[in-house]
Amino acid sequence: MAENQINSPEITEPSPKVQKLDHPENGNVPFFRVKKLSENAVLPSRASSLAAGYDLSSAAETKVPARGKALVPTDLSIAVPQGTYARIAPRSGLAWKYSIDVGAGVIDADYRGPVGVVLFNHSEVDFEVKVGDRIAQLIVQKIVTPEVEQVDDLDSTVRGSGGFGSTGV
Protein backbone atom coordinates (compact mmCIF):
# COMPACT_ATOMS: atom_id res chain seq x y z
CA MET A 1 0.00 0.00 0.00
CA ALA A 2 2.82 2.43 0.84
CA GLU A 3 4.36 1.82 -2.58
CA ASN A 4 1.12 2.87 -4.29
CA GLN A 5 1.05 6.07 -2.26
CA ILE A 6 4.57 6.96 -3.42
CA ASN A 7 3.69 6.48 -7.11
CA SER A 8 0.29 8.17 -7.01
CA PRO A 9 -0.59 11.54 -5.50
CA GLU A 10 -4.13 10.35 -4.80
CA ILE A 11 -5.46 6.82 -4.51
CA THR A 12 -9.10 6.44 -5.44
CA GLU A 13 -11.17 3.32 -5.04
CA PRO A 14 -13.85 2.52 -7.60
CA SER A 15 -17.37 3.44 -6.60
CA PRO A 16 -19.54 0.54 -5.46
CA LYS A 17 -22.09 1.61 -8.12
CA VAL A 18 -20.71 0.16 -11.35
CA GLN A 19 -21.59 1.87 -14.63
CA LYS A 20 -23.31 -0.42 -17.10
CA LEU A 21 -21.45 -0.43 -20.43
CA ASP A 22 -24.56 -1.23 -22.47
CA HIS A 23 -26.06 2.07 -21.21
CA PRO A 24 -23.05 4.39 -21.00
CA GLU A 25 -23.52 7.76 -19.34
CA ASN A 26 -24.12 10.65 -21.77
CA GLY A 27 -24.01 8.22 -24.72
CA ASN A 28 -20.23 7.82 -24.41
CA VAL A 29 -18.39 4.53 -24.08
CA PRO A 30 -15.84 4.63 -21.22
CA PHE A 31 -12.19 4.87 -22.19
CA PHE A 32 -9.64 2.08 -22.03
CA ARG A 33 -6.57 4.00 -20.84
CA VAL A 34 -3.01 2.92 -21.65
CA LYS A 35 0.35 4.23 -20.40
CA LYS A 36 3.55 3.44 -22.33
CA LEU A 37 6.40 2.60 -19.94
CA SER A 38 9.17 2.60 -22.57
CA GLU A 39 9.91 3.53 -26.16
CA ASN A 40 9.52 -0.15 -27.11
CA ALA A 41 5.90 -0.25 -25.94
CA VAL A 42 3.27 -0.47 -28.69
CA LEU A 43 -0.26 0.77 -28.04
CA PRO A 44 -2.83 -2.04 -28.23
CA SER A 45 -4.84 -1.96 -31.45
CA ARG A 46 -7.64 -3.92 -33.08
CA ALA A 47 -6.86 -5.52 -36.43
CA SER A 48 -10.37 -4.83 -37.74
CA SER A 49 -13.43 -2.85 -36.69
CA LEU A 50 -15.19 -6.02 -35.53
CA ALA A 51 -12.21 -7.60 -33.76
CA ALA A 52 -12.96 -8.50 -30.14
CA GLY A 53 -9.37 -8.19 -28.97
CA TYR A 54 -6.66 -5.55 -28.97
CA ASP A 55 -3.33 -6.95 -30.15
CA LEU A 56 -0.55 -6.82 -27.53
CA SER A 57 3.05 -6.55 -28.69
CA SER A 58 6.36 -7.52 -27.15
CA ALA A 59 8.58 -4.74 -25.81
CA ALA A 60 11.66 -6.99 -25.52
CA GLU A 61 13.33 -9.85 -27.34
CA THR A 62 12.43 -13.03 -25.51
CA LYS A 63 13.06 -16.73 -26.09
CA VAL A 64 10.25 -19.12 -25.18
CA PRO A 65 12.06 -22.45 -24.80
CA ALA A 66 10.72 -25.62 -26.39
CA ARG A 67 8.15 -27.17 -24.04
CA GLY A 68 8.71 -24.18 -21.75
CA LYS A 69 7.32 -20.79 -20.85
CA ALA A 70 8.42 -17.17 -20.65
CA LEU A 71 7.04 -13.89 -19.35
CA VAL A 72 7.08 -11.38 -22.21
CA PRO A 73 6.91 -7.68 -21.23
CA THR A 74 4.63 -5.27 -23.09
CA ASP A 75 5.91 -2.21 -21.18
CA LEU A 76 2.31 -1.02 -20.86
CA SER A 77 0.14 -0.23 -17.85
CA ILE A 78 -3.60 -0.10 -18.37
CA ALA A 79 -6.83 1.08 -16.78
CA VAL A 80 -10.00 -0.61 -17.99
CA PRO A 81 -13.43 0.86 -17.24
CA GLN A 82 -15.11 0.01 -13.95
CA GLY A 83 -17.39 -2.98 -14.35
CA THR A 84 -14.91 -4.68 -16.69
CA TYR A 85 -11.68 -6.64 -16.58
CA ALA A 86 -9.12 -7.36 -19.27
CA ARG A 87 -8.41 -10.93 -20.32
CA ILE A 88 -5.23 -11.82 -22.17
CA ALA A 89 -5.99 -14.44 -24.81
CA PRO A 90 -3.94 -16.31 -27.43
CA ARG A 91 -3.62 -15.15 -31.01
CA SER A 92 -5.01 -17.90 -33.20
CA GLY A 93 -2.17 -17.68 -35.74
CA LEU A 94 0.53 -18.23 -33.11
CA ALA A 95 -1.43 -21.11 -31.61
CA TRP A 96 -1.99 -22.84 -34.94
CA LYS A 97 1.35 -22.21 -36.66
CA TYR A 98 3.76 -22.35 -33.70
CA SER A 99 1.89 -24.07 -30.82
CA ILE A 100 2.15 -20.91 -28.68
CA ASP A 101 -0.47 -20.47 -25.95
CA VAL A 102 -1.16 -17.84 -23.30
CA GLY A 103 -1.61 -18.37 -19.56
CA ALA A 104 -2.66 -16.45 -16.43
CA GLY A 105 -4.34 -13.58 -18.18
CA VAL A 106 -6.73 -11.65 -15.91
CA ILE A 107 -6.18 -7.93 -15.31
CA ASP A 108 -8.53 -6.39 -12.76
CA ALA A 109 -9.89 -2.85 -13.14
CA ASP A 110 -7.84 -1.65 -10.15
CA TYR A 111 -4.45 -3.04 -11.30
CA ARG A 112 -2.01 -0.38 -12.52
CA GLY A 113 1.27 -2.30 -12.82
CA PRO A 114 3.05 -3.39 -15.98
CA VAL A 115 1.27 -5.89 -18.22
CA GLY A 116 3.23 -9.04 -19.01
CA VAL A 117 2.15 -11.99 -21.12
CA VAL A 118 2.91 -15.57 -20.09
CA LEU A 119 3.61 -17.56 -23.25
CA PHE A 120 3.71 -21.36 -23.28
CA ASN A 121 5.56 -23.13 -26.08
CA HIS A 122 4.04 -26.56 -26.73
CA SER A 123 6.43 -27.31 -29.61
CA GLU A 124 9.83 -29.01 -29.72
CA VAL A 125 11.54 -25.85 -31.05
CA ASP A 126 12.46 -22.63 -29.21
CA PHE A 127 10.24 -19.69 -30.18
CA GLU A 128 11.94 -16.31 -30.64
CA VAL A 129 9.92 -13.18 -29.89
CA LYS A 130 11.20 -9.91 -31.37
CA VAL A 131 10.42 -6.37 -30.20
CA GLY A 132 7.10 -5.32 -31.73
CA ASP A 133 5.84 -8.86 -32.41
CA ARG A 134 2.13 -9.26 -31.72
CA ILE A 135 2.05 -11.94 -29.03
CA ALA A 136 -1.46 -12.00 -27.58
CA GLN A 137 -4.74 -10.16 -27.58
CA LEU A 138 -6.41 -8.27 -24.79
CA ILE A 139 -10.18 -8.58 -24.53
CA VAL A 140 -12.13 -6.20 -22.29
CA GLN A 141 -15.13 -7.99 -20.79
CA LYS A 142 -18.01 -6.95 -18.55
CA ILE A 143 -18.13 -8.67 -15.18
CA VAL A 144 -20.80 -9.58 -12.69
CA THR A 145 -19.78 -9.77 -9.04
CA PRO A 146 -22.73 -11.13 -7.06
CA GLU A 147 -22.72 -11.32 -3.29
CA VAL A 148 -21.67 -14.70 -1.87
CA GLU A 149 -24.41 -16.51 0.02
CA GLN A 150 -23.70 -19.64 2.05
CA VAL A 151 -26.51 -22.21 1.87
CA ASP A 152 -27.12 -25.66 3.33
CA ASP A 153 -28.26 -27.15 0.00
CA LEU A 154 -28.18 -26.24 -3.68
CA ASP A 155 -31.10 -26.62 -6.08
CA SER A 156 -31.27 -29.92 -8.00
CA THR A 157 -30.43 -30.13 -11.70
CA VAL A 158 -30.53 -32.92 -14.29
CA ARG A 159 -26.74 -32.94 -14.43
CA GLY A 160 -26.31 -32.95 -10.66
CA SER A 161 -22.72 -33.48 -9.56
CA GLY A 162 -21.60 -35.05 -12.85
CA GLY A 163 -18.14 -33.64 -13.56
CA PHE A 164 -15.49 -34.07 -16.22
CA GLY A 165 -16.88 -35.85 -19.27
CA SER A 166 -20.29 -36.46 -17.70
CA THR A 167 -22.13 -34.84 -20.62
CA GLY A 168 -20.10 -36.64 -23.29
CA VAL A 169 -16.66 -36.34 -24.79
UniProtKB/Swiss-Prot annotation:
Pfam families named among the record's database cross-references: dUTPase
Disordered: annotated span: 1-25
UniProt biased composition (Polar residues): 1-10
Entry cofactors: Mg(2+)
UniProt-annotated binding residues for substrate: 91-93, 105-108, 116, 159, 164-165
Molecular function terms from GO: dUTP diphosphatase activity; magnesium ion binding
GO biological process terms on file: dUMP biosynthetic process; dUTP catabolic process
Keywords from the named record: Hydrolase, Magnesium, Metal-binding, Nucleotide metabolism
Source taxon at top rank: Eukaryota
Expression sites by tissue: Vegetative and floral merismatic cells and provascular and vascular merismatic derivatives.
Cystine pairs: none
Record EC number: 3.6.1.23
Enzyme superclass (EC): hydrolase
Pathway participation: Pyrimidine metabolism; dUMP biosynthesis; dUMP from dCTP (dUTP route): step 2/2
Family (UniProt): Belongs to the dUTPase family.
Assembly and oligomerization: Homodimer.
Name of the protein described by the UniProt record: Deoxyuridine 5'-triphosphate nucleotidohydrolase
Lineage, uppermost ranks: Eukaryota, Viridiplantae, Streptophyta, Embryophyta, Tracheophyta
